[in-house]
Amino acid sequence: MSAPIKSSSGGGEAKVLSSAEIARDLVFTGIITALILTPIVAIRTQLDQGSLTWHPRFGLALSLAGIVVAARLLFHVLVWNPRAKAALEPDTEASRPVVAKGPSLADRLGPKVGPILLVLAILLPFFFIAIGHSSGLFPGWDRRGIDFAITVLLYIMLGWGLNVVVGLAGLLDLGYVAFYAVGAYTYALMATRYLPQWFGPGILPYAFFISVPIAAFLASMWGMVLGFPVLRLKGDYLAIVTLAFGEIIYQVLQNFSRFTEGPRGIGVPKATFFGIPFDKSDSGFASLFHLEYNRIQYFTFLYFVILILALVTFLVTRKLRRLPIGRAWEALREDEIACRSLGINTTTTKLTAFAIGAAFGGMAGSFFAVRQEFISPESFKYIESAFILAIVVLGGLGSQIGIVFSAMVIIGATEMFRELEFLKYVLPEGTEPVQFRMLAVGLAMVLMMRFRPRGFVTKREPTVYLKEKKSVSADLVSQGHG
């Protein structure tokens, strides 16, 4: 890697890289990364009938190099920010007035990040389909790429849901996977038992769209059930109770076989496009829209479903944060005693945080069930709660954009280990590289807690201001007038 964005000269003044220097640094980083990854990742060797053959994977190497360059750019924008560096450096001239500077690169790009990510998310499946049907450089990337994007969006939605409880309200929840499970089993049971029993088999094509709001409602009710016993708890005690709640739900799903089928699990029917199935029949999606049948059409449909659900989660959370309930969550997070002294009902504030966060988890769970087409209690162990919490913590508590970047990095690293099959020849026999994904997540958390304890996006601004912020000279501040 090249030198950081700022370097100290002999006179002690910091040098800020220009845009051209940053671009040169990114090009240099990409070239070095590509050269390193070419012999390691791009060339895959395999024993085939006693002979050693090699399979080129230059697309994967270039993609990983692009991820490294993107991460480097994020560090330039978010970590090596000149304003953040200046705030940490001691001021040698105490009497020098504080002069308002122009907006930093992060401030200028901040409002544009969300719309840019949304446009990229809409175009992403078509990009994967295009490269999947290209000249063979990326075989199978249409299915794999869209499936990876679905996983990332699913965990982004889960992260935003948990962010309501942990990031905004400051309530440490280690049992969030319980609401995820409630949503998944709600859809599975509604689609396989109750909806056909109540309305007949003709309701099955619409079971998913009917079950999503029901799953959100039932999960929110369970969130309130969890919220009542922990109203007076905080910190470690709250974490232990929520952890126990998640384990209770897992044990119920595992042992209440007459209702949940236990370890055998439940098969789940596929979703349809408002009653139009994705199959080869004359009434299928491809026939009605005069398209050639391809299974990728169903996965593209699932991608846009989870994109819409995630977008709803983002917009609702953003709107609630600006309402009185959102400001009450932030007040509760900062100081519960001061929150009570201001007349805020902490009971309803906590319960609404648990209920709304659980509702988003239930919606994500119902989508998980229809995507997997099979669910069992093994999908809802504590490790899932830890994984979601890691995404929230690494992204930055209270930061929605930070959770997006964190989910992409963590899920991307997890999937990358599936591709590092060359490690099988280095590691002991029988060792799967994918088993080291949690080791990488743990190492990332240790490094983040050491160097950026507030996450990828650390900027926490108040939701509302009483007055516009003004520049104040240092001499007034030293006299206590600022």
Regions from the PLM with identified roles:
Residues 2-482:
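Transmembrane alpha-helices and adjacent helix-loop boundaries
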